[in-house]
Every structure is written in C-alpha cells, then in structure tokens.
C-alpha cells in the first residue's frame, strides 16, 4: 500500500485527484498540501469531501513531502518547476499535472508560458505521460509530466494517422471546445455565470500554451509535421472537451479501413473507445470517466479525414490520466481505481 500526497488539492483537478486516490485500492494514505493554507480541512473548500480522515491541508515543506511514495502536483505553472526537482533527487516519484515539464526546450516554455522554465536537466528527464503511446517509458518514470487536457484529446485523435503517415503534414486543423472547469476554480470575469451562460466564445487564438506541446509530440512521431492551426472555445458546460480534427489525406482512404486502423492502434488500451463508422461521440458519453471516445469520417470530395475526440477534461484530461500513469509507475494495472463507467445522463 502506498502513501501519496497532493499539492494543490483546493483546485478542481486536485479535488478530482483526491476523490480518485482516496478510493484507490493500493493507496493507504492520501494527504493534501497547499502553498497558501495550513491546518484547514479540505471540506472547507469542497463540502462534498465531508469529514474524511487525512484531508487536512498541510504547509509545503520538502522534508515532509519526501516521506511519500509519490507526490502529485495539481498546481499553476511555476510551482512544480520549483519544488519537484528536490523531491526527484530524494527518490520520490512525481506526477505533475501542470505544464512545467511538458516542453523539452526551456526557451519555448518561456515564450508560451511567460516565465522561466524548470532546470533543463529535469526537462530532459521528465517522461511525457500520454499513456497509450508511451507506456514503457511511463513504467520507468520518476518524474512524470501529465499531458494537458487539449493535447490529450488532440493527440489521441491524431496519433494513428500521423504515425502511419496517412495525412499531409502541413494540413492539420484542430477546432477544440472545453467546459468552464478547464479554466480552473479561481474567480474571473471570463468565467462568471452571466458571461458564460448561453454563450460560446473563442479564446487565445493562435496563442494557446498547449500548441507547442501538441506540435512537440506530433513531431516526435513524424518530424515533417508542420505547425498546426489550433483554436479553443469556451462552452457553457462544466466538464468536457471535444476536439474536432481535420487533415488532408495523402491518398484516398476507405472509411472502414480508417476505423479498423484506430481499433487496431488502440487494441489493449482500456480507456480509448472507437465508434463504429458513422457514429460520433458526445462529451456526455465520457462525463466523469477516464475514457476517450473517438469517431471518424473521410470525405472523398475534399480528401479530408475528420476525427472527433472527446474526453472529460478533469479525468482523462487531468486527474484520471495522472492516476493511470501512477498505476504504471508503480507496476500495477493501468486501470486500477479508474474502472467506473461515465456518469449519465
């Protein structure tokens, strides 16, 4: 049985992590830490937690954190980059849900995140935890960088096409939409009910920090992939991401062969579900779960492939995938503690 800690448990992803780890079959203790609160029970921020044991927030201290088998960072940019290296040096396994270790080039991180990157030695050491496509590296990881929510949906949707070289490398367009929880829990005008309700709006046009993360992964699979066109929209719902992906095929593809390719690619991946030809997923189909559902189409007229990829941004896009990676790092079945079906309706 493992003892684990969560830093940043007062945010949405941190609270979801606590929910998953509190009921995990191999976790005996899950403690919570905060950079701003000490001695306060987590239920003060999240009443749904109730008066459970071990949910009192502790002050961040390296020596206190070093006693855990694994530490999860569910923190804003900059926190894990400062604290994680010392834990890694002490042999603690770190799973980071922020973007601090996703980009291998510190200069690229500084450009897109507007702050100094973590030490380069740790950027190189970090394993990118897109579980379905990096299992062996994840199993041996000490410092695990959990993918972002948009990159998870996008990369799972694109991987088979890019790896098989079936699409033109300069033709990728991603139109992504997210629920409001993706913006975090901190109050702001942009996520105020009156601003979001009955409204759809685009944001961070050509400037979203997940763009270089997606391109880095795509170019790892195929170095010829050109910069992508990527847009993000805020939708008046709590959870969910839908990434609608378009790419020009190099040659005509049978729609049935396309579906077969994806089914073969994700055979043995318990959390990726491929729809039958002509069927497309909705965000409600994965709500509250660690699943990624994918639907596919090919248009002979335009020679374009369309991929529809949906996830729950707080689960497969954050806490769920983090636990999936944690499971592999500890030598367990990747589905431990994650087998619940989506919540419906």
Curated annotation (Swiss-Prot):
<dbReference type="GO" id="GO:0005737">
    <property type="term" value="C:cytoplasm"/>
</dbReference>
<keyword id="KW-0560">Oxidoreductase</keyword>
<protein>
    <recommendedName>
        <fullName>N-acetyl-gamma-glutamyl-phosphate reductase</fullName>
        <ecNumber>1.2.1.38</ecNumber>
    </recommendedName>
</protein>
<keyword id="KW-0521">NADP</keyword>
<dbReference type="InterPro" id="IPR000534">
    <property type="entry name" value="Semialdehyde_DH_NAD-bd"/>
</dbReference>
<keyword id="KW-0963">Cytoplasm</keyword>
<dbReference type="Pfam" id="PF01118">
    <property type="entry name" value="Semialdhyde_dh"/>
</dbReference>
<keyword id="KW-0055">Arginine biosynthesis</keyword>
<dbReference type="InterPro" id="IPR023013">
    <property type="entry name" value="AGPR_AS"/>
</dbReference>
<dbReference type="Pfam" id="PF22698">
    <property type="entry name" value="Semialdhyde_dhC_1"/>
</dbReference>
<comment type="pathway">
    <text>Amino-acid biosynthesis; L-arginine biosynthesis; N(2)-acetyl-L-ornithine from L-glutamate: step 3/4.</text>
</comment>
<comment type="similarity">
    <text>Belongs to the NAGSA dehydrogenase family. Type 1 subfamily.</text>
</comment>
<feature type="active site">
    <location>
        <position position="149"/>
    </location>
</feature>
<dbReference type="InterPro" id="IPR036291">
    <property type="entry name" value="NAD(P)-bd_dom_sf"/>
</dbReference>
<dbReference type="GO" id="GO:0070401">
    <property type="term" value="F:NADP+ binding"/>
</dbReference>
<dbReference type="InterPro" id="IPR050085">
    <property type="entry name" value="NAGSA_dehydrogenase"/>
</dbReference>
<comment type="function">
    <text>Catalyzes the NADPH-dependent reduction of N-acetyl-5-glutamyl phosphate to yield N-acetyl-L-glutamate 5-semialdehyde.</text>
</comment>
<dbReference type="GO" id="GO:0003942">
    <property type="term" value="F:N-acetyl-gamma-glutamyl-phosphate reductase activity"/>
</dbReference>
<keyword id="KW-0028">Amino-acid biosynthesis</keyword>
<dbReference type="InterPro" id="IPR000706">
    <property type="entry name" value="AGPR_type-1"/>
</dbReference>
<dbReference type="GO" id="GO:0006526">
    <property type="term" value="P:L-arginine biosynthetic process"/>
</dbReference>
<dbReference type="GO" id="GO:0051287">
    <property type="term" value="F:NAD binding"/>
</dbReference>
């Amino acid at each position: 049985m493992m003892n684990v800690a969560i830093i940043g448990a007062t945010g949405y992803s941190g609270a979801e992590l606590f929910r998953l780890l509190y009921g995990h079959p191999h976790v005996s203790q899950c403690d919570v830490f905060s950079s701003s609160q000490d001695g306060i029970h987590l239920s003060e921020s999240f009443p749904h937690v109730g008066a459970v044991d071990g949910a009192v927030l502790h002050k961040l201290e390296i020596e206190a954190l070093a006693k855990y088998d694994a530490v999860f960072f569910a923190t804003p940019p900059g926190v894990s980059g400062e604290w994680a290296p010392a834990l890694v040096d002490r042999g603690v396994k770190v799973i980071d849900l922020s973007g601090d270790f996703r980009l291998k080039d510190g200069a690229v991180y500084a450009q897109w995140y507007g702050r100094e990157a973590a030490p380069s030695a740790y950027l190189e050491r970090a394993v990118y935890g897109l579980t379905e496509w990096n299992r062996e590296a994840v199993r041996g990881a000490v410092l695990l960088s959990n993918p972002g929510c948009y990159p998870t949906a996008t990369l799972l949707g694109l991987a088979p096409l890019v790896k098989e070289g079936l699409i033109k490398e300069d033709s990728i367009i991603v139109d992504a939409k997210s629920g409001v929880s993706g913006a975090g829990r901190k109050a702001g005008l942009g996520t105020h009910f009156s601003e979001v309700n009955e409204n759809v709006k685009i944001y961070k046009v050509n400037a979203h920090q997940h763009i270089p993360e997606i391109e880095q992964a795509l170019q790892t699979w195929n170095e010829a992939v050109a910069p992508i066109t990527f847009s993000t929209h805020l939708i008046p719902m709590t959870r969910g991401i839908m990434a609608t992906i378009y790419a020009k095929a190099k040659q005509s593809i049978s729609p049935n062969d396309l579906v077969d390719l994806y089914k073969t690619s994700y055979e043995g991946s318990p959390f990726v579900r491929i729809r039958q030809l002509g069927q497309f997923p909705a965000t409600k189909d994965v709500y509250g779960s660690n699943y990624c559902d994918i639907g596919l189409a090919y248009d002979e007229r335009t020679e374009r492939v369309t991929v529809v990829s949906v996830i729950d941004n707080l689960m497969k896009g954050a806490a769920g995938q983090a636990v999936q990676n944690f499971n592999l790092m500890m030598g367990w079945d990747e589905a431990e503690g994650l087998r619940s079906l989506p919540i419906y309706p």
